[in-house]
C-alpha cells in the first residue's frame, strides 16, 4: 500500500507486471538513483579515461562515505574513483577489481538505506571466534545509560493509515528484547524522542529522496531521533510482500527495523544476513535480528547476553 491512491496504483501497476531482469530497473529521479538500462554502459568504462556522468557517480560514492572529501567532481575515471569502487567491492564481499563489473552494478542498483556505509568498523572478534561486521556512527553515540523508554510519534502530515503505524510498531518490538528499551507511541510529534516522517524528494534535511527505488529511507544517529521514509515508494504494510503483484513493492516493517537500528546507534553491516545490511531487494521480507545485529547493539549499550 502506498500513501497515494494505492488502490488505483495497484490496479495500474498490476497490469504492467513483468519479470525482473538481472539488473534491477531503477529510475534516475535524483542524484543517487541509477537508470537500469543506461547503467550497462559502465561495464565498458576503463580507468584513465573521461566519461560523461562520472561526476554524478563520484557524488554517489561521496554520499555513501567512499569518497571522504567533496571537491568539484569531474568526469575522469581517476584513482579516487578506482579506490572508492575497490572499497565498495570489499565492503560487499565482491571481487575487488576497481571497475564496474556486472555484480558491482547489480549491488549498486539494489534499493537501499540512505545512511552512509563508511562509519566505524569494530573489527572485533565475537565470542564465537567470528569477525563482526557491525559498525557504529562516529564517536559511538547512543541513548543515555539507564534509558528504559523512548517515545515516538508520526508527523501530522501526511496522515498515515493504521496499518502503516502497526507495521512500524512491530519493527520497534524487534529491538526491545535486546536493548531493554520500550518504545511508546505518542501524539506529541514535537516532544517525541523519535519523529517519523514519510516525505518526497527534498524534505528539510541534507538527504533528499529520489522517487521510486534507489533510497528507501534514512535515520539519524542518537539522540537526533529523526526517521524518514520515501513516500514515493510502494510500501506494503500488511500482507505478504513476497506475493505482491507489484514488482517494486517494499516491506515497510523490514525497512523500519533497519532504520530503528540507526536510531539506536548502529551503522551498516557487511553481513548479508544482518538487518543492518544496507540493501534490500523489492518484494523481500527481513524482520528478524541476526546475531551480528544483536552483538552490535549489545556492544554499544553494554548489555550482556
From Swiss-Prot:
Cofactor: record remark: Binds 1 zinc ion per subunit.
SUPFAM superfamilies tied to this protein: Metalloproteases ('zincins'), catalytic domain (SSF55486), PGBD-like (SSF47090)
One Gene Ontology term from the biological process aspect of the record: collagen catabolic process
Signal peptide: 1-28
Glycan-bearing residues: 95, 123
Motif Cysteine switch in this chain: 111-118
EC number: 3.4.24.-
GO molecular function: metalloendopeptidase activity; zinc ion binding
Transmembrane segments: none
Record keywords: Glycoprotein, Hydrolase, Metal-binding, Metalloprotease, Protease, Signal, Zinc, Zymogen
Record-listed Zn(2+) binding positions: 113, 258, 262, 268
Cofactor entry: Zn(2+)
Database matches in SMART domains: ZnMc
Propeptide: 29-133
Pfam families for this protein: Peptidase_M10 (PF00413), PG_binding_1 (PF01471)
GO cellular component, one term: extracellular matrix
Residues annotated as catalytic: 259
The UniProt record lists the keyword Zinc: yes
Record remark on domains: The conserved cysteine present in the cysteine-switch motif binds the catalytic zinc ion, thus inhibiting the enzyme. The dissociation of the cysteine from the zinc ion upon the activation-peptide release activates the enzyme.
Family (UniProt): Belongs to the peptidase M10A family. Matrix metalloproteinases (MMPs) subfamily.
Function comment: Matrix metalloproteinases (MMPs) or matrixins may play a role in the degradation and remodeling of the extracellular matrix (ECM) during development or in response to stresses.
Protein's name in the database: Metalloendoproteinase 1
Amino acid at each position: 500500500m502506498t500513501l497515494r491512491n494505492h488502490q488505483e496504483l495497484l490496479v495500474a501497476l498490476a497490469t504492467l507486471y513483468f519479470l525482473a531482469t538481472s539488473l534491477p530497473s531503477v529510475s534516475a529521479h535524483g542524484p543517487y538513483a541509477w537508470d537500469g538500462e543506461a547503467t550497462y554502459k559502465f561495464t565498458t568504462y576503463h580507468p584513465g579515461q573521461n566519461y560523461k556522468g562520472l561526476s554524478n557517480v563520484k557524488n554517489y560514492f561521496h554520499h555513501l562515505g567512499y569518497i571522504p572529501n567533496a571537491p568539484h567532481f569531474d568526469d575522469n575515471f581517476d584513482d579516487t574513483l578506482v579506490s572508492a569502487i575497490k572499497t565498495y567491492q570489499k565492503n560487499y564481499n565482491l571481487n575487488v577489481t576497481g571497475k564496474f563489473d556486472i555484480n558491482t552494478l547489480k549491488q549498486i542498483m539494489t534499493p537501499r538505506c540512505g545512511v552512509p556505509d563508511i562509519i566505524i568498523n569494530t573489527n572485533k572478534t565475537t565470542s564465537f571466534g567470528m569477525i563482526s561486521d557491525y559498525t557504529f556512527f562516529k564517536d559511538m553515540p547512543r541513548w543515555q545509560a539507564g534509558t528504559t523508554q523512548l517515545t515516538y510519534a508520526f508527523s501530522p502530515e501526511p496522515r498515515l493509515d493504521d496499518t502503516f503505524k502497526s507495521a512500524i510498531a512491530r519493527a520497534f518490538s524487534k529491538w526491545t528484547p535486546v536493548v531493554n528499551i520500550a518504545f511508546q507511541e505518542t501524539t506529541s510529534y514535537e516532544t517525541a524522542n523519535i519523529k517519523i516522517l514519510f516525505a518526497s524528494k527534498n524534505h528539510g534535511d541534507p538527504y533528499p529522496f529520489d522517487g521510486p527505488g534507489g533510497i528507501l529511507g534514512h535515520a539519524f544517529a542518537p539522540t537526533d531521533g529523526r526517521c524518514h521514509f520515501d513516500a514515493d515508494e510502494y510500501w506494503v504494510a500488511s500482507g505478504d510482500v513476497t506475493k505482491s503483484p507489484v514488482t517494486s513493492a517494499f516491506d515497510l516493517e523490514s525497512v523500519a527495523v533497519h532504520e530503528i537500528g540507526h536510531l539506536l546507534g548502529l551503522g551498516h553491516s557487511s553481513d548479508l544476513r544482518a538487518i543492518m545490511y544496507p540493501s534490500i531487494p523489492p518484494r523481500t521480507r527481513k524482520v528478524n535480528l541476526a546475531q551480528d545485529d544483536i552483538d552490535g547493539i549489545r556492544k554499544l549499550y553494554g548489555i550482556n547476553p
